[in-house]
Amino acid sequence: MGQIIDGKTLAAEIDKQTMTEVQKLKNQGVEPHLVVVLVGENPASQIYVRNKEKRANKLGIKSTLVTMNADISENELLLKIQELNQTEDVNAILVQMPLPKHIDAFKVTMAIDPRKDVDGFHPVNVGKLFEGKTQHTPIACTPQGIMEMFQKYHIDIQGKRAVVVGRSSIVGKPMAALLLNANATVTLAHSYTKNLAALTKEADILVVATGIAHFIKEDQVKEGAVVIDVGMDRDENGKLTGDVDFENVEKHVSYITPVPKGVGPMTISMLMKQTVNLTKWSI
């Protein structure tokens, strides 16, 4: 039976450290300031944004929400980002995805000052991550949260075979880069990968981010592996579940993250920690 990695408790510990750092900055007369830009009225995005605001307020981070209509032009959004880039007391900028179809998300990401890119998606920051130059570099929050989990649970990465299933820019690619930087041998798999089970069964560390409920079954996992489930799916009964068949896989692994209370809580805590880091790096 695998040990459960408790993301909720770990996230609370990180929040506590972040609060201390916020207080230190405030003692120097500096208030960390996160600006979230929300375009349109996507209900899921509104929930995410509300959660970020609530967490920021709880930790003493100033948080501003900029709402824009779904029919604004791409240029109007780019001008708003430019204005935030030039606003001295704004330390961190986050544009909530997805954006309306007529707006190019890559252009928007490119427009954010890399020094204020709290999501770690700007090509400059992604390039630094792949070069292994991560000092003073914002990194995608979910993969960064997973690395914190490895550290906290003393999970050794060096020399291990790691398989990441899912190649998004938000999780898969930065996760692969972080594992590579930590001296793992990394395979990045995706929906076109042939004989996926042959790869996953070899993995000492398996990170799954496909968005497909119970995508990974017990016969696809190596005995004693570390399994990280990034999925947030709904099963046929509407119950929140992950990309891994937790109940059956848990019996075979050394460590596993549950859904909920696994990777999810870490992401928002890392976002707050990164807001504080961007503030410190700007002083």
Swiss-Prot record:
Function: Catalyzes the oxidation of 5,10-methylenetetrahydrofolate to 5,10-methenyltetrahydrofolate and then the hydrolysis of 5,10-methenyltetrahydrofolate to 10-formyltetrahydrofolate.
This protein's name: Bifunctional protein FolD
Domain of life: Bacteria
A single GO cellular-component term on record: cytosol
Associated pathway: One-carbon metabolism; tetrahydrofolate interconversion
Family membership: Belongs to the tetrahydrofolate dehydrogenase/cyclohydrolase family.
Swiss-Prot/TrEMBL keywords: Amino-acid biosynthesis, Histidine biosynthesis, Hydrolase, Methionine biosynthesis, Multifunctional enzyme, NADP, One-carbon metabolism, Oxidoreductase, Purine biosynthesis
Annotated CDD domains: NAD_bind_m-THF_DH_Cyclohyd
One GO MF term: methenyltetrahydrofolate cyclohydrolase activity
Keyword Disulfide bond appears in the UniProt entry: no
Oligomer and partners: Homodimer.
Species this protein is from: Pediococcus pentosaceus (strain ATCC 25745 / CCUG 21536 / LMG 10740 / 183-1w)
EC number: 1.5.1.5, 3.5.4.9
Chemical reaction(s) catalysed: (6R)-5,10-methylene-5,6,7,8-tetrahydrofolate + NADP(+) = (6R)-5,10-methenyltetrahydrofolate + NADPH; (6R)-5,10-methenyltetrahydrofolate + H2O = (6R)-10-formyltetrahydrofolate + H(+)
Alphabetized InterPro entries for the sequence: Aminoacid_DH-like_N_sf (IPR046346), NAD(P)-bd_dom_sf (IPR036291), THF_DH/CycHdrlase (IPR000672), THF_DH/CycHdrlase_cat_dom (IPR020630), THF_DH/CycHdrlase_CS (IPR020867), THF_DH/CycHdrlase_NAD-bd_dom (IPR020631)
Chain sites annotated for binding NADP(+): G166, R167, S168, S191
Pfam short name (any one): THF_DHG_CYH
The organism's taxonomic lineage, starting at the top: Bacteria, Bacillati, Bacillota, Bacilli, Lactobacillales
GO biological process terms on file: L-histidine biosynthetic process; methionine biosynthetic process; purine nucleotide biosynthetic process; tetrahydrofolate interconversion
